[in-house]
Each structure stands twice: as C-alpha cells, then as structure tokens.
Amino acid sequence: EAHGAHFIYHEAFPESAANSGADIVIQSLHKTLPAFTQTGLLHLCTDCVTREMMQKKLSIFQSSSPSYVLIASIEQCIHICNENRGYFQQYYEKLWILREKLEELKYIKLVPTDDIGKLVFSVKDTTISGEELFEILRDNYHLEMEMSELYYVIAMTSVCDTQEGYDRLYQALKEIDSEITKKNTEYLFLENDFHQNKKMLKPEEAATKDRIQIDYDDAKDEIAAEFIFLYPPGIPLVVPGEVIDKYVIDKIRQYEQYNMKVIGLDDHKIYIINR
C-alpha cells in the first residue's frame, strides 16, 4: 500500500488494507505524508506472522546502522498527522475544488479514481501524448508529476500541498488544454498478450557470457544479453538468455514510434550474446 499511508485520516479515502484483512501491510510514508524520502512502515495486522519471526527475517536485510534522522522523521510524521487531523479535512476540501475546476478542461480529461488524492489525466484522442504532457509540465511549469505513459499522466497530491500549488497545476493544464486539439487516434494497446520467447540460457548464465551491441533491427534470432522492457508496466519484452524474434523487434519499433522510453535500448541498439 505504497501510496496509501494517508487512507486512515479521512473517510473520503479508500479503506486501508490494514483494516481490510491483510496480514502484512507496507506503507511508504514519504509518498503522501510529511516524512523524509525512504521512510516507511511495516504493519503486522494479524497473527499470521509473529513479531519475532518478522524481526528475524528483517535482520537479514536491514542495516545494523539505521538512520536515526529517518526514524525521527517517521515519529514526527505520525505525531503531526495524529494531532492535526483537521489538516486532512482541509486537504479533502481543496481537492474537491480543484477536481471541479479540472473537470471543465476540454481535451485533457480527469479520470475517476478511488483515491481522490491521485489525479489521473487522460490525453487520449488529443494531439499530445502522456509523455509530452509530463515533459511540458516539468520544463515549462516546474511541476513534477508522479509518472506518465502513452495516454496518461498521474499527479500525486498530499496533505502538504498548498493552494498555490493547486492553482499553478490548474493554470498550467488550462493553458496546455487551450493549445491542443482532438484527433482521431489509432490506439497502441500495451496489454500483455502472453507472447512466449524461446529460452536458450538461464538469465544467470547469460550474465556470464561475452556480449556485443548491435542495432535492434539486425537482432532477429540473436540471444538477448539484457532485459528489454517498457516502464510502466515493467513487463519484459525479452529476458537475458531468450531469443529475440520478430515480435520483439516489432514491439520495440512500435514503442519508439510513439516516443516511449524503452529500458534496455541505447540509441537504437541492444546488447546480445556474442556467439
């Protein structure tokens, strides 16, 4: 529940997994609450896992020298939120006013979400992509969004956001909306269609082989030396040790056509096993 640490502070937010039957819930405080980056909480909600067992497992991965600055930030965050629940009512009211104004945009559409604090903007059927909207907001308006993909941009809000920040976001989107138009779009579907690549090596075996970099157009029937994927959603097109077939090459070309960032692609080149 990375983006759900704030759920318990107002009834307008979704029910927290911690109150919905989950055994263990991990929340990132820094994503939606006033806490330093890297701070989070692990909740044991049932007796499925004992505290002793959890401490034993965590000791394998956790540092023996924790940051007391981050620990203090967590404690301060919890104190502020518990003692000032009225802030969340103000947050809720400002969000609804902002959402009502955003609904008036002509081309950029505000997509309904369960969490009103998550603003999802659709640019389907418009003359810009989600990636382009993301870059315009960053470069021209100094507004940092959470993420983007071909047709969408997500803005994460928090109880710490100011009215000035909401006004800047609305004015920026209003200006951009006035400069774009509607267009007929041939949609690129990104759903996983369960294409099965031929496996020649295990990933750990591929990692030990010599590799070379070639143009992906010339990589048909070669063996991949690195993961190639689009993020989001992060599902690999090909895994190290798998054969690169026509499907993979066509998908990479399709993603490039829409100016989407393909991880594992470097200036039209990819790494393959040197055979």
Q: Where in the sequence are the language-model features?
A:
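Conserved C-terminal alpha-helix-loop-beta "cap" of PLP-dependent enzymes
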Residues: E103-L265
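Charge-dense polyanion-binding interfaces
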Residues: K261-R275
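Short C-terminal domain-edge/linker segments immediately following a structured domain
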Residues: A2, H30, K56-S59, L150-V153, ...
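Conserved PLP-enzyme active-site core in the AAT-like
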Residues: E1-K109
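Short amphipathic alpha-helical patches
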Residues: C81, C160-E164, R275
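Surface-exposed loop/turn and secondary-structure junction residues enriched for glycine/proline
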Residues: I8-E11, F36, K57, F61-S64, ...
